Amino acid sequence: MGEETDKEKPSPRREGGAVRHRLPSLASLLARAVAGQRLPSVISGQVGRFPESVLDDAAITLTEADILGTARPRLATQVSNSRALGARALRELAVSENADLDPRLQLALANRRSGMRGFATASTEADEVSVIAHVRTLKAWREHPDVMAGAQLGKAKGRGFLVTGRIPIDRVEALAAETDILDLRAAQPVHPTLGASVEQTGADPASFPEGFDPQGGDGVVIGVVDYGCDFAHRNFMRADGSSRLESIWDQLGIASIDSPMGYGRRYSAAQIDAALSASDPYDALGYGPEPDSPLRTGTHGTHVMDIAGGNGTGSGQAGIAPEATLIFVDIAASDISRMGPGVVNQHFGDSVQLLEAVRYIFDEAGDRPCVVNLSLGTNGGPHDGSSLVEQGIDALVEGDSNRAIVIAAGNSHGDGTHTSGRVTASGSLDIGWDHPGEWGGEFELWYDGDRRLEVELIAPDGTRFGPVRPGSSLPLGDHEVIIFIASIVGNRTNGDNAIGIWVAENVMEGEWTVRLTNMTSQGTDFHAWIERDDYAQSYFTQPVESHTLGSISTSRKAIVVGAFDGHKASLPVYTYSSTGPTRDGREKPEVSAPGQNVFAARSRTTGGVTRKSGTSMAAPAVSGLIALLYADAARRGQDLSIDELRDELIRRARRDPPKGGKSTWHPRRGFGRAHI
């Protein structure tokens, strides 16, 4: 058996109030690079993961720069690599941007106008960008000549609809200006974030309350959006050897004429069953999980799916809902190139393909109750439930009964990736932002829409960039964008203001300063977050440990799950389990579940298990519980809206210590430990 923590970054420790991280060794970075690459079949045994034009390119050479992560991909919504120019060598680029646009779209345009050409990704061509849009009418979006329409997510709050799609970068401004398009947002990166699980959640049939008969979740669909599905593990097979998986959508697979949303490859139950009869099922199907590596003992998705719905046929230990039907979406890393140096620091996926994955699962489920597990997240965003991604999540579950989305709270407690404070009237305030090893980073700050903050970025050597006034942006570099600062006034989704800063690798190691100057006569409160980086996390020198939930974990209608250690008598909170509330003060997470040292199915085995920790392991335990609740309700002829389901989960939760039925909320435990 192997073991792996869901937090694959070095553990931070406090030194003088700051968070310190040990940089990865060269050997570990090489191992990550090799493990992270989705290689052609002639190299890794993987089949059907690359377009045919790439399959002939068998020899891939990793330079030292690639291994060290100093040569990240040049993609539309990322800053370029600075080639160790240093801060003083940067100058303002003569490119004009529309300051009303989403900052990521502004960056895409700045990159395009400075001559950078993006890579093609799983669902976009070169110089296209994935977007989430708020539109007046579906017809206008679907028939627009510049749009490759994706998924319809549902009705938006107030008016219109939420949709996804792909558009050319050079048409972004024109589309954003059209009256039928109310808002346009670029894709945002997201990352992956049993014995004790069954016992602590009360999912053992012997302990069910009288009259509760979920029949193992029979008749309910559990969908998992993650990476890596070991469909040949016996925990996902019936007694007759057939698969419990109704389908797999591999978003990175070679597209066919019937590909969902126009990309990737769908594998049906019949195709999976045929592959299971072969000596090498993964080769026969043309899909399989990544091989094990010194740093990853088993794929994330296989482990997550087993916790929610494995039947124990192979391992001897069933998950929470062993009779449920399973659907898996292997999400594509759409914010990175699928070859070359980008593999060193690849993202898990993106928010557009995430929403399309959930839409696909609900469509496949049809009239059956369905819960979708998302053990992933991101730090950027308003953290108030207003982002188009979160509105999309809400729309997907509000339209029908018996639909739920469960999201891991995140593992950011103690990382130093959140801070907050107040800039006094007409005063200034400095935020320390430490960059280890010249790795760069991404910073996002939100404050009230009736206030105005000017921002200046100061490098460790004292070089100043800015100031940037509200409603303007500043691209800096040497022909290409190396630093990008954007200040948005009146965000369309919530009316608040936002400041975004992107710093490329190799600019300068050390403590950067973000200087805020209040342009109003009233004190201005703010919250700021740093985007997650699993290899060398930048951090605030004076972090605030509240409000560390992942940004999609602040959705209004998703069920958000924290983690505790189910092996210890005191059931302590998992060390890294993120902390609520949301920026607008709502109480999340809803519940917590076992997430530390959880044993479940191991990749590339038919019956093995491995140990992992994190809120990624807690979320599927709750997904399995929801499947049981849905199955019992269906047996009694009842439907559950998402609000009724949330109330039922909170009502059944175990308080620790017991509060006599009082619904006391804890910023990390939620309303209690999830239980039948």
Task: For every predicted segment, state its role.
Residues 249-250, 260-277, 402, 415-508, ...:
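Extracellular S/T/G-rich loop segment that most often corresponds to the catalytic His/Ser-adjacent loop
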Residues 521-533:
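Edge beta-strands of jelly-roll/beta-sandwich modules across compartments, strongly enriched
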